[in-house]
Amino acid sequence: MARIAGIDIPREKRVEIALTYIYGVGLTRSKLILSNTGVNPDIRVKDLSDSDVQKLRGATEDFTVEGDLRRKEGMAMKRLQDIGCVRGRRHRMSLPVRGQRTRTNARTRRGSRKTVAGRKK
């Protein structure tokens, strides 16, 4: 396995797809990295030469990926919570941040249903 940005990328996949296993690298950024380095996107990772792997390592260092990106996102969220803005409070309460409805839906964000006892008549 080739190790790029601290991640073992899968050997059997095409380079274009394998680079997306790195957190912070999607298909668009993967294509950009490959065009900048001149590596063929259709080649498999196992067929890459050592010089190609070195080029890819150098190109990914130009971007914020993996741990640095996770830390940066976490700090941005913590900043919102510290200043007490609406977005920060919504993050803290594990509710949708961007104005979605919560009376129904929002199950992913709110977690599984908690059963509430019905009223006796």
UniProtKB/Swiss-Prot annotation:
One of its GO terms (biological process) is translation. One of its GO terms (molecular function) is tRNA binding. Keywords: Ribonucleoprotein, Ribosomal protein, RNA-binding, rRNA-binding, tRNA-binding. Disulfide bonds: none annotated. One of its GO terms (cellular component) is cytosol. Residues 100-121 have a biased composition (Basic residues). Pfam families: Ribosomal_S13 (PF00416). The keyword Lipid biosynthesis does not apply. Residues 89-121 are annotated as: Disordered. Coiled coil: none annotated. The keyword Heme does not apply. It comes from the Bacteria. Part of the 30S ribosomal subunit. Forms a loose heterodimer with protein S19. Forms two bridges to the 50S subunit in the 70S ribosome. Located at the top of the head of the 30S subunit, it contacts several helices of the 16S rRNA. In the 70S ribosome it contacts the 23S rRNA (bridge B1a) and protein L5 of the 50S subunit (bridge B1b), connecting the 2 subunits; these bridges are implicated in subunit movement. Contacts the tRNAs in the A and P-sites. Belongs to the universal ribosomal protein uS13 family. This is Small ribosomal subunit protein uS13.
